[in-house]
């Protein structure tokens, strides 16, 4: 009985955690709900902070989630060549993304709720990336060539699939957003890690000589 009570409390806590806050609901429904939501920019201090925050799961069956999904698509379509967008980029720190599926016929845009990468290949590719939230920034990044992905749709149905190539890169980029990871910061970290590795090698080399 005690074990059941603990599980029930955990379940209720999980459900409550997925509930949107009044502020989130207000933002999602502001203005014309059929229009695009503004895309947050790192050049704005408040918006930048939102982009750096961790995102939490969302209730896929909440009617407001459907509105968010729809408006995020409009936001992506309003850009010049954007291939993906994450909820933090429209001010909502929840786990929702849109990705253009270059691995499918017609290259459709598809949404993904509470996406999780459960596996990444060790084999990586180096390729260019930009970001709708970071003006005038583009650089080369390493990403896993293949990933295993799990997610749900608006009905709460669970899916799992393997994705590879450029589409896998987009997924990794957008899911990074859900963890508050921006490619500008990612580049700084990679450069710092590279510097530390080289510096450590030089120190080690000087000792052995």
PLM segments and residue spans:
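Sec-dependent N-terminal signal peptides
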Residues: 4-13
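Positively charged
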Residues: 17-209
């Amino acid at each position: 009985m005690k074990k059941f009570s603990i599980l029930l409390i955990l379940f209720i806590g999980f459900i409550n955690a997925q509930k949107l806050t009044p502020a989130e609901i207000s933002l999602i429904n502001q203005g014309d709900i059929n229009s695009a939501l503004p895309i947050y920019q790192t050049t704005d201090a408040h918006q930048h902070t939102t982009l750096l925050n961790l995102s939490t799961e969302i209730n896929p069956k909440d009617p407001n989630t459907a509105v968010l999904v729809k408006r995020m698509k409009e936001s992506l379509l309003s850009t010049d060549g954007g291939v993906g967008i994450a909820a933090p980029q429209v001010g909502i720190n929840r786990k929702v993304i849109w990705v253009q599926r270059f691995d499918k016929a017609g290259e459709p845009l598809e949404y993904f709720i509470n996406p999780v990468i459960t596996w990444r290949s060790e084999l990586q590719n180096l390729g260019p990336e930009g970001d709708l939230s970071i003006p005038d920034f583009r650089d080369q990044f390493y990403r896993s060539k293949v990933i295993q992905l799990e997610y749900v749709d608006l009905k709460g149905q669970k899916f799992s699939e393997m994705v590879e190539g450029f589409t896998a890169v987009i997924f990794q980029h957008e899911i990074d957003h859900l963890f508050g990871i921006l490619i500008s910061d990612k580049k700084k970290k990679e450069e710092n890690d590279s510097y530390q590795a080289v510096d450590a090698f030089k120190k080690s080399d000087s000792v052995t000589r």
